[in-house]
Each structure stands twice: as C-alpha cells, then as structure tokens.
Amino acid sequence: MSQATAKVNREVQAFLQDLKGKTIDHVFFVACGGSSAIMYPSKYVFDRESKSINSDLYSANEFIQRNPVQLGEKSLVILCSHSGNTPETVKAAAFARGKGALTIAMTFKPESPLAQEAQYVAQYDWGDEALAINTNYGVLYQIVFGTLQVLENNTKFEQAIEGLDQLQAVYEKALKQEADNAKQFAKAHEKESIIYTMASGANYGVAYSYSICILMEMQWIHSHAIHAGEYFHGPFEIIDESVPFIILLGLDETRPLEERALTFSKKYGKKLTVLDAASYDFTAIDDSVKGYLAPLVLNRVLRSYADELAEERNHPLSHRRYMWKVEY
C-alpha cells in the first residue's frame, strides 16, 4: 500500500479494491442542494482527466424522472446526502441499483437510509474540527481520483491525496488571511436584500452552494449564482454601484472567464467582494492539482464569511422557516 493510499478513507479503499476489474463507461453524480454543489468540481475533474468515461451531474429527482438511457450495468453512481435521509437521493440510489449500476453513497450518518440503499457507503467528517481530507469534499475526491487511477491508470491520484492531506494547513492560513475581510464583509452586507455570486469551472459549485444554501436557505437573502461565462449574455446588465457581487477566481483552466467578468464588474460596479485563490499559499500542493483543490479552499473561506454575516445579522445559519418544519 502506498503512502497516499494509506491516507484514504478505509471505506473508500474497500470500494476501490472491489472496483478493480470492473468495466465502467459512465459516472453519474447524484444529489440535491449543497450535496450536489460539492460534486461540481468532481465533474470538472472527470471532464479534464478521463479519456474513456463520460460523466454527468444530476439533481436526484431529475435523475429518476429523466431516466438517462446510458444508465446501466456499466455505470457508477456516486450519491451524497449529509443526513442520509434526503428522500429524492435515497430513491435515486434504489433507482440506479434497479438499473444494474454500481452505487456508492457519501453521508455523515452511516446508518441512514441512503447508506442502507447503496452498495457501498463512505462516511465523512463534519464541523470545524474535521480535517480537510476527511470532509465531504475530501472523501469525494478520494473516490474520484481513486476511480480514475483504478479504471484508467490516471497518474494524479498520489498528488491529489497528498494535496488533500496538506490542505488543512492551506485552510488555516487562508482563514487567518481573510479574518478581517470576513468581518468587513459582514458589516458592509448586513442590510443587503440581494447578493449575487459568480465563478466558473471547478469553482462554480462553490458559488452555487453559497447562493442557494448560505444566502437563500440560511440567511433569506435573495441570490443567484452566475456563471462567469454567461455573465456577458444577459446577467451583466444587472450590475451597477448598488448591486453586491461575490466573485471567485480559481486556479483552473477557466480562470480567464472569471478574470474577464471581474474586469468588467470593477468598471461598472462598486460592491464587489473578490476571493482569489491565487492569493492563498498553495506552495505545498502539486501544480497538477492546484486547480482542482482551489474550490475547496474558496469554499472554506466563504464559510467564514457566512459565519460573520450570520453573527452581524443576528440570524443563525441554523434558522429555518420551512425546511424540516412543514410539508413539502
């Protein structure tokens, strides 16, 4: 066992061992909400790295209703639900198995319905004390890069796992670097009724998650995650000096899209919060995977912005009016 493999979640190790010798021609990422958002970088990895395996990302219920014709015995379906009892995702696991697909579920609760429905389950850690490599993002990347290594002999597994192992230190430095900025953001946006987010490539899922989970779900602030590549095809008409934007710049191949959007926004906007992964210390991370790991750092930093905003607005991130409280 290599040093990198030894750092991989044991449940993921078991899955990867059983994956050897299997034929997979399609990977489906299936989840809802924030659990779906964390899968965007992994879809990006497959697009960039896989030579023979197609991949798609679906909201769980649409996965069932659309019923992709490619779904079958040569498919791998990766699912995620933090609670493990998201009804649509549990049903999606059963649906996929019914089609003969191989399924692995990620969850914080290994005894949950989703864990029982999938053939394999990988538990991740959660909370401020969780190490980066053991979080939902970290475990998902273990599955993704491990799958690429097993099925296609992809060479980035070692670099990705070592990078995940070093990522906690990157988090800690970035959080210190952004501490004052997060407080200033909270004070400046305390009374805002709408905040847009924008990114592209591997980073888009982070913008999407912050928009739908943090701002809309947890703070009841109107929001929309704008793809930087789509900005100049409609959305840029909304910007002026009164409209707040959070703009993310990553380290992947689509960074020029984000830079172009930022340049225009600086010209016509004023309330811009810019998080640039290039300003964080990635020196311990191999160059070949920096673009893939940057979204994880941006996500962690943005969480600190969310904590400060919730504190400033006296609106706890745990507060809900519909979710888990009414029938829906």
Curated annotation (Swiss-Prot):
GO terms of molecular function: carbohydrate derivative binding; glutamine-fructose-6-phosphate transaminase (isomerizing) activity; hydrolase activity
Domain SIS intervals: 15-153, 181-311
UniProt-listed InterPro entries: FrlB_SIS, Fructosamine_deglycase_FrlB, GlmS/FrlB_SIS, SIS_dom, SIS_dom_sf
GO terms (BP aspect): fructose 6-phosphate metabolic process; protein N-linked glycosylation; UDP-N-acetylglucosamine metabolic process
Family annotation (Gene3D superfamilies): 1.10.10.2240, 3.40.50.12570, Glucose-6-phosphate isomerase like protein, domain 1 (3.40.50.10490)
Entry EC no(s): 3.5.-.-
Keyword Repeat: yes
A Pfam short name: SIS
Keywords per UniProt: Carbohydrate metabolism, Hydrolase, Repeat
Record's keyword annotation contains Transport: no
Function: Catalyzes the conversion of a range of fructosamine 6-phosphates to glucose 6-phosphate and a free amino acid.
Subunit structure: Homooctamer.
Full protein name: Fructosamine deglycase FrlB
Organism expressing this protein natively: Bacillus subtilis (strain 168)
